Amino acid sequence: YLNDIVNAKIKCSYCLTEPSAGSDANSGKSKAIFSEDKKHFILNGQKMWITNSGFADVFFVFCKIENDENLSCLIVHKEWGVKLGAEENKLGIHGSSTRQVFFENVKVPVENLLGERNKGFKIAMNALNAGRIKIGVANTAIGKRAFKLGVNYANEREQFGEKIANFGAIQEKIAQMATQ
């Protein structure tokens, strides 16, 4: 899978959040049980707020296997019966698709267990931590750009014959932007 992902031959989606679990990912209800021949998992569950789900070919699904206490991760192909909810109407990040994802008796080969059984939570957290760093960097850049635009605007806009950058209220707002 890695070669196809890196070379953009397949698109992926990361399925962790569930309606009843929220931030406590390990309390999710999605579950996989072994098929009678033990060659497949039968996956059932629901995920929500799943980024890229509308155009993903493959889903990394965090679920419990049988009666395990901890999550595992299964690699699930869309064509195996994954169903998608309606597109979420988001305030921002319009370049990605965000939907609910449903698994109803989806048959997944046992070879598609990513890593070790019961070790999915560590996989999930490692992926989230990398994303958190990127989001922090992006938000810092957005803040710097907003500050620069605000200062430029305050130095260009005039009211009552004076640049608004000279008004105390505007200076206070700019100072707050610079320090926060």
Regions flagged by a language model, labelled:
Residues 30-34:
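A structural signal for short hydrophobic beta-strand segments in well-ordered beta-sheet cores
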Residues 19-29:
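Active-site-adjacent elements of ketosynthase-type condensing enzymes
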Residues 8-16:
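A short, Trp-centered hydrophobic/proline-enriched beta-strand micro-motif
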Residues 82-180:
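Glycine-rich beta->alpha junctions and the first turn(s) of the following alpha-helix
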Residues 1, 27-28, 46-48, 85-89:
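Short beta-alpha junctions and helix-cap segments that line functional grooves
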Residues 21, 48-54, 93, 130:
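Glycine-rich phosphate/pyrophosphate-binding beta-alpha loops
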Residues 40-84:
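A short core secondary-structure module
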Residues 4-9, 77:
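Soluble sensory domains of the PAS superfamily and closely related sensory modules
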